UniProtKB/Swiss-Prot annotation:
GO-annotated molecular function: alpha-catenin binding; beta-catenin binding; cadherin binding; calcium ion binding; extracellular matrix binding; gamma-catenin binding; identical protein binding; protein kinase binding
All copies of domain Cadherin, residue ranges: 165-272, 273-387, 388-502, 503-609, 610-720
Record-level GO BP terms: adherens junction organization; blood vessel morphogenesis; brain morphogenesis; calcium-dependent cell-cell adhesion via plasma membrane cell adhesion molecules; cartilage condensation; cell adhesion; cell aggregation; cell migration
Protein name per its UniProtKB record: Cadherin-2
Gene3D superfamilies hit by this protein: Cadherins (2.60.40.60), TCF3-CBD (Catenin binding domain) (4.10.900.10)
PROSITE patterns: CADHERIN_1, CADHERIN_2
Cross-referenced SUPFAM superfamilies: Cadherin-like (SSF49313)
Keywords: Calcium, Cell adhesion, Cell junction, Cell membrane, Cleavage on pair of basic residues, Glycoprotein, Membrane, Metal-binding, Repeat, Signal, Transmembrane, Transmembrane helix
Source organism (scientific name): Gallus gallus
Amino acid sequence: MCRIAGTPPRILPPLALMLLAALQQAPIKATCEDMLCKMGFPEDVHSAVVSRSVHGGQPLLNVRFQSCDENRKIYFGSSEPEDFRVGEDGVVYAERSFQLSAEPTEFVVSARDKETQEEWQMKVKLTPEPAFTGASEKDQKKIEDIIFPWQQYKDSSHLKRQKRDWVIPPINLPENSRGPFPQELVRIRSDRDKSLSLRYSVTGPGADQPPTGIFIINPISGQLSVTKPLDREQIASFHLRAHAVDVNGNQVENPIDIVINVIDMNDNRPEFLHQVWNGTVPEGSKPGTYVMTVTAIDADDPNAQNGMLRYRILSQAPSSPSPNMFTINNETGDIITVAAGLDREKVQQYTLIIQATDMEGNPTYGLSNTATAVITVTDVNDNPPEFTAMTFYGEVPENRVDVIVANLTVTDKDQPHTPAWNARYQMTGGDPTGQFTILTDPNSNDGLVTVVKPIDFETNRMFVLTVAAENQVPLAKGIQHPPQSTATVSITVIDVNESPYFVPNPKLVRQEEGLLAGSMLTTFTARDPDRYMQQTSLRYSKLSDPANWLKIDPVNGQITTTAVLDRESIYVQNNMYNATFLASDNGIPPMSGTGTLQIYLLDINDNAPQVNPKEATTCETLQPNAINITAVDPDIDPNAGPFAFELPDSPPSIKRNWTIVRISGDHAQLSLRIRFLEAGIYDVPIVITDSGNPHASSTSVLKVKVCQCDINGDCTDVDRIVGAGLGTGAIIAILLCIIILLILVLMFVVWMKRRDKERQAKQLLIDPEDDVRDNILKYDEEGGGEEDQDYDLSQLQQPDTVEPDAIKPVGIRRLDERPIHAEPQYPVRSAAPHPGDIGDFINEGLKAADNDPTAPPYDSLLVFDYEGSGSTAGSLSSLNSSSSGGEQDYDYLNDWGPRFKKLADMYGGGDD
């Protein structure tokens, strides 16, 4: 089913259904009538009008594709896949939600045959306007109530609500309404208003978002109203959301979308993009020649009559040779010629008054506007250029270039500064060597005869040139014109004093090095090209001589040496030495020229070879670690290598300790002859002889350092290692520092342990009333045994009663005593009989110790971790106190402070 942009199929109005039926029948009729089937899109451009607000998944339009074979698989695609998607049925969907701009949105829909890979394309234009804007006020009044899309139905014993399958149609509201305001539009309600007290509201641009206050709603009745006139050119449609909540603000219905389309009215005149339009047309153009296009725009809906424009020409000035020389396409604004006879020489410009009218050009109801079109008749080349004289004259000094020697003037009746007027000049004779060229002055159209190559007066004293002139474009066909215009240019060459020049330049001389100072080397002279001027004389001088080896005679140019020529000099590059000399005449003005003398120095055997490197290192034992040496000779072949290497006979220790072997023409190896050579530095003389004729030899001294080597043959010189590492004193200092550091650490640990013991001893002297800390003390250390082994067992008799302690002064009480306060009296427990009355002895000793501050234990740190080798006493499990077996009150333990809380809980904690 074909769907019109943005309108669901179930709510299409009758007008849309008729249009849809027409669209569906049109291609079928065409298919039946056509004899041949042509696959593809039926149109190149498909235009559609959609809402300005596009939602993701919204169907926009249906593209038609004509397929001649139903079995073919056609796949559709979009050039903007992020915004638009084309389904298999040709329906274009929006991929995401966005707002269309004021300008039409364009993209390309493509269709591809899966088998043949043939592809067709069609451009789609989306205009941001509502699909239907022509609904009448009668149609609007029919939409009285908008009910939230839910309906009730009975399910067994109770009612249920089900979402309706329909979409609320847009509300069409004409712009520029005169009211009265507020103007009621529609009533929004929920079918649950019978059982609940509801409150209605709308949100969105135009309601609670800018521009706010355009649409209001009665919260009780749901009546939606507009408060002021609307302007379609500012906002073409409003997208509102209606909400229904109960009196507590709880959502009762899902929000519904309400689209209000502003119907366009013809309230804007057409406006031309420019008030004055300029165009050109060549003279003599045939009827139907395109001239220009004028364009006007209308702010009203371009898809309705309000925005459909038509153009026409109101007047033409001048009216020669015909009052209707031009016509205009009433829809596109294209201006073309309709009559012949355009002649620039008679009429150079036409002025047309153009009118644009909307309502498809209806003169009664349409609004119109005018603009001016100025058409300039351009010139064609119907007049050739003509020289103003038959002969032109000029002169030029010799050896000058880029000099204008003559101006050629022409006349042309065509329009200045056009291709039909601009002249081009050609030389048809008199310049076989290309000494001249003719340029065109863009302002005056004159021909500028210019020298491009130097002219020698001694060769040519005068030139007679023949030139012709033509335009940049060829002459128009069918027009009679005179023959091409030509002229003669006579140019005289003026003689000037020219610079002398050396011959040859540069001059090459081959000479062996070692030429003594004062020797004649060569003669280097120059020539004066001025043969027709008064005889001049030349003088020579030296301009550049880097090594200062040469001098030149100022009259005859004879060059002699002032120093010995040395090929090995730093001023010689690649055997070549360069010097520059100057030749000057006495003309007016005086001129000079330079010449370069190149001396190629041939090598002689004047340098003896030397050893390289000058120092080497080897092991003190005979090992395969020979020293590689190289002979270096500044001379070149044949005065250089191959070289001969040998050791001198004196002193004898040289050949006794060393041996040398040549391994190539330039290299040799020096090695020990004996098994061991004491470490040290030795000067080894080596005699090297080159291959020159005569031979040149020299004795070079090689300093060899003999040292101890490791198993890899690398030198392990102890002095070098010590020099590179730490000395003995430094190592001893480091060790002493480490020992001192360890002693300090040990002393610190001992001091920490001693301080901990002192802290523990001080804890016993702290008054528990002043030092109340919830700490757990350890009392299971009993010392190393009893010191007094001589005791009377008969004294260990359990006392009948326990007397209360005497009250001691504050400050002499021990920390292990009970607190000083009146103690309750407890009944004496019956003591079990015990042989020897050990219990009495213990009680008496305990009482005496408690009452005597001088009796042990003293307030000092005692050691109780040694119990001796064994105890002679038997088991103490049968010892009884005077209170054994009886109930005692241990509440006094609670007065001892937090340290004895655990003990108090054990004895006085009640049932626990």
